[in-house]
Amino acid sequence: MVSNGHFAYAEDDPVASYEHGVQVVDEDKEFNPNLSKYLAYEGVTPAGFNYHLISVFGSQSTGKSTLLNYLFGTHFSVMSETERRQTTKGIWMSKNKRQDCERENSLPHLQNNRMADNILVMDVEGTDGRERGEDQDFERKSALFALATSEVLIVNIWEHQVGLYQGANMGLLKTVFEVNMQLFLKDKKSTPRSLLFFVIRDFLGTTPLQNLQNTLMQDLQRIWTSLSKPPGLENSTIEDYFDFEFAALPHKNFQTDKFVAEVKKLSMRFREGHRDPSKGNKTEGGIFLSEYHRRIPADGFAVYAEGIWDQIVNNKDLDLPTQQELLAQFRCDEISREVLVAFDEAVVPFETKQAEAAQSGNPEVFAGLGPAMKNARVKTLSAFETEASRYHKRVFQMKRAELEDKMDTRLKVLFSGQLTAAHKSGIAQFSDAVSAAVKAGQKKGASYDFADIVNKEKRIALERFEDDAKATVIEGACWSNYTQELALYQKDLEKISAQLRKDEMRRLATRVERWVRSRLGESVGLEFNALGSGRGGSGAPETGDKPSEDTIWDRIWSIFVATVLEAEQRFTERASSFDASLEEVDVGLWRLRRKAWGVLRSKIDEEMMEGNLLLKLRENFEDKFRYDSAGVPRIWRPTDDIEGLYTKARESTLTLIPLLSRFRLQETNATPQLDRWVGYTPSAATPADEEDLVPIGGVDDDGKSLEEEMTMLSETKRQDLTVRFKKAADGVYVEAKRSAIGGMTQIPVYFYILLLALGWNEIIAVLRNPVYFFMLFLCSVAAYIIYQLNLWGPMVKMAEAASHQAVEEGKKRLRDLLEPSDIGHHGMKYKNGTEQYEMSHVRSGRNATKINERDDDDEVEGEETW
């Protein structure tokens, strides 16, 4: 784009395009979008508030651009000496170049007397030009734009124009006053001030500068008075809104050297100054006062200026506060996006890791998360405050709060995730540590204090959680408080501790139950093994009297109660080291009693299984039948009352069946008060405490009564057991009877007399024959030696064994020979355990008929196993 005979801006060559500055607004009222690039190119953007904006007004072709070029070292286009036409079109801007030259050439001790930094100069299109004619729209818009943005308004007039209305730009100044009043009405909270700097050109000195100053002030007062003021401002003065400065410069062409010197002198006035209250607020130093500054940061000036011009060119009411707020919103949002880039670089890696860990189901405590969050938050807020605090305060605070919310929303998620991970990992580590310590104590075989282990590991877990939480806390963030999380963590630790204690008490109860099972198994087994032993041999106790069979349940109950009482003492003593509550101990003891009864009942059922009980009844019967009261085995003779002893022993043993069929105490003649002994269900018991318990009749509501619980044998089993026992007893009786009958075979005395009479010749023959006699002698000597060595007994036993074996073998072969034939007698076999009895038909006296009847029954029944 070409304007004023040179490029206004070009993208390819910034140095060439910005040699003459930048055209802010062209003659068609279009705003230049590259203004921000120019400010960045000139290094003004990072200046913040350390910049100043000056605008120059004046009639066309009065040397405004020339004045600026000499005064600020700019390169604005100037009018050709041979032509009288418009040169500056629209509004141009350039940075002060004289400042850079002075900084390079001045000595260090003169640095404080140089021009202010970052002075921006706007060259406004001249008024009263023939190109615009009577169109004063751009004149008014440009004046409003300059007044809304500039600190100092330079009015360029010639000396001979002072006192004139149009020539002295009084019409333009009236426009300036009117638009200033318009701006003031929109911004009632403050009174914006500007400096009107009159530079009188071609000053000859004939009329003193003070007189020219008075003339101009009178004209300005008159214009101000003629303005229509809004309500409440009727008595306002021009000094309420403007300050005035005056300077005079000699003729440029006729007094060139003096002009240059005065311009240089004038340039030194463009620096920071202040009001001295001791001198009536008189300005000292430079002309740039802080109250003139529009408080628009340099990095937002381009956006602000564009918004101002858009309002002006569209004939909208210009509202500077609103524009400042809009600018602040725009720039704060922009700055927020910029600073969040660095924030994302610091935070996103942790967010990604935490999300992956949560998705995998293994939350992880990340080291360094807390410092990273703190640094990211502090640096982001600091960077935002550095850049954005220069803008509208309310907007800045609002945007700062929004930025904090954005960051805190993400940081809070990280914070919560970190605490959640610390919570879960802490609970897992606590549980594992307690279990490991308990196992270590069990392996050592020594007693360990479970409560001490839990308290120690709980303290370690709390310290670890607090360390992780403190490392993640962000100071100043209201959400960065882990009090609730810590309370929840402590609550879960207590819950886990209670569960671990409950599990340990369960294990303790299991160990005690095993001990009870072992003790009851031995004690109850001994009672049943000693059941009905009627002899003083192996079945009787080593010391003391034989226990009565009638009191077997009393003894079992006493053993049971004593064993459980000892187990309860063991449980209570061990549970005290768990720091268990009374309720938990009560539940444990209640469960122990129920479990112990189940163990006893199981042991009784085992002992009273049909095979076991039948064996014990047979042993009881045999002890009473085969042994006398002293425990000596009976040798059956035909003269013994076998049938009487058999009947007595059988009936005595049969009395045990009804005795054993019901758990009844002999002392009270009633069943034990099991429901009272077990006790009521503790109030602290949970359904989990009862789910593995076997219902007990008379205690639980399972439909069984206490009598049914104490019934060990049903009526059907009793009858079946009685029948089978009688058959086994009959077999023992038959064996005893056969043994008695076998003892009757004796050799008569007359047989020996007959043998001597009939064998006398043979005896004489032996005595007369030397060989026979010698053989007899040898046999006699051998018999004598055997007698002396006491070997007759062993030899007789060996002979008996050999003969018995020969007889058995003969019987077997004879049986095999007669087996296909129906002729012969068949023996009956009675088995019990590993014993086998073979019986043939025994017919003798009055017992022959009875034995034959039993044999007939046995042939029908077949073989019985016990």
From Swiss-Prot:
GO molecular function terms noted in the UniProt entry: GTP binding; GTPase activity
GO biological process terms, alphabetically, are: endoplasmic reticulum membrane fusion
Its EC number is: 3.6.5.-
Indicate yes or no for the key word Metal-binding: no
Q: Tell me how this protein sits in the membrane.
A: Multi-pass membrane protein
Q: What does this protein do?
A: Cooperates with the reticulon proteins and tubule-shaping DP1 family proteins to generate and maintain the structure of the tubular endoplasmic reticulum network. Has GTPase activity, which is required for its function in ER organization.
Protein's UniProt name = Protein SEY1
- The record's gene field reads SEY1
